[in-house]
Amino acid sequence: MSTNIIYCFSGTGNCLDFAQNLAKVLGDTDIVMMRSEPVVTDATAAKRVGFVFPCHGGGLPEGLEECIKSVKISPDAYVFGISQSASYLGTGLYKLNKIHHLDYWKGTTHQCSCIWLFPHTMMLPPVPPKFAQKRSEKLAVKIAKEILAGKVTEKAPPCNPFNAVESKVWPKLVVKKSRKLAVNKDTCESCGQCAKLCPKGNIKYVDGKPVFGANCIQCLGCLQYCPTESIYMGRKTQKREHYHNPNIKAIDLMQTLIHID
């Protein structure tokens, strides 16, 4: 087992890119993806164990809490958590800290990927995509150095009451919005990427075109990575510019484990 393990959930690449940038500085790191059940849950031999994930509806992405609970960590390990969102911290780190005590945690911001809610430029502070990416890369290096130094965050992650309520309402909203997932059959090239990318197997091909089920968790990888931008979720998403991390390809998100020396 590697010296470091980072458990990562990423829908459109920002969190995976951040995890990889952390790993490049930490060295000897396994990045275990949590888009579905992690392939490695026994992390007791790792010196450092981290979690990198986005904020979905004020909280953790659907199903992620169960994945986190399945991970076994040595009581001597240094544990850290990074939550990435477009604006606010959410309750993800608070929930993570209740499961695995965090020695270090940090909230970061990047471009918004929830295209049906906001355009991707809707982030705080508002900055151009290229600047946001460079800032994210520099911050990952800074955080990785703090982790290597064993820095400890004195205060526990907060729980914002508004976000706590929001995270309880979010699943119902997701079900409603997911019913609007559709494809433009005229422009769809039937490449099959969306079905392979979906962490829940929610996309099936019928007569050569994707059909969406009712088990969407709003990672939105299918929509944001569609090479012909044929997938949409209501009129707003047809008008707004699509976005995914420039350094992460769809095939990268399909991996279950990525090792970085």
PLM features: residue spans?
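Short alpha-helix adjacent to the SAM-binding motif of class I
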Residues: 17-18
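FMN-binding flavodoxin-like domain, especially the glycine-rich phosphate-binding loop
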Residues: 2-6, 12-14, 23-36, 43-53, ...
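Short secondary-structure boundary/hinge segments and terminal tails
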Residues: 40, 113, 206, 234, ...
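Iron-sulfur cluster-binding cysteine motifs and their immediate structural context
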Residues: 183-184, 189-217, 221-238
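Flexible mid-to-C-terminal extensions adjoining Fe-S/redox cofactors in radical SAM and related proteins
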Residues: 223-224, 228-261
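Poly-acidic low-complexity segments
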Residues: 41-42, 129, 184-185, 211-213, ...
